[in-house]
Swiss-Prot record:
Name of the molecule in the record: Protein Smg homolog
Native organism: Shewanella pealeana (strain ATCC 700345 / ANG-SQ1)
Family from the record: Belongs to the Smg family.
PANTHER family named in the record: PROTEIN SMG
Superkingdom to which the source organism belongs: Bacteria
Matches recorded under Pfam families: DUF494
InterPro entries given in the database record: Smg
Native organism taxonomy: Bacteria, Pseudomonadati, Pseudomonadota, Gammaproteobacteria, Alteromonadales
Length: 157
């Protein structure tokens, strides 16, 4: 499923090619690309749920204190490693992620049918969520810079 999400993001969203609106056509395209029907359905459902989260004002995403600290559940800690959790915290601290967007990211990560995701996978999920979050264009651009910027090895200038 994650491979399909990456395929869609890289071939349609990130390349600025117009995404096919018709789900049947998109399913056919993904099948021709070699993906299995069951995985396609899961990926499209994942994207629909992401869109629902953007529109719903889901209470669990909004019921928080700005000064609170996120405690991860056991299942979340098993799927999201320490490095990735630290990266999420870092993004909150530099204001790339709001608390609500962080919760959307965690929600979407937990719905991916992989036992664990590495930091690079988490970064792509963050990018997908930010891309689909109206009003977060600046955060999306910052996240893109963090993903695609190649460090030159120097810590100080």
């Amino acid at each position: 499923m994650f491979d399909i999400l990456m395929y869609l993001f890289e071939n349609y969203v990130h390349s600025e090619v117009e995404l096919l609106v018709d789900e049947d056509e998109l399913t056919k395209e993904l099948t021709r690309a070699g993906f299995h029907q069951s995985e396609i359905i899961k990926a499209l459902s994942w994207l629909e749920r992401l869109a629902d989260l953007q529109e719903a004002g889901t209470p669990y995403l909004c019921n928080h204190d700005q000064q609170s600290f996120r405690i991860y559940t056991k299942a979340e800690m098993e799927k999201i490693d320490v490095e990735s959790r630290g990266f999420l915290l870092f993004l909150e601290q530099i204001k790339v992620l709001s608390v609500e967007i962080r919760e959307m990211v965690i929600d979407r990560v937990m719905e991916i049918d992989e036992p664990t995701l590495n930091l690079d996978d988490i970064k792509w999920v963050i990018l997908m969520v930010l891309f689909n979050a109206p009003g977060h264009e600046s955060a999306y651009e910052q996240m893109e810079d963090l993903i695609f910027e190649q460090p030159d090895g120097r810590l100080h200038s």
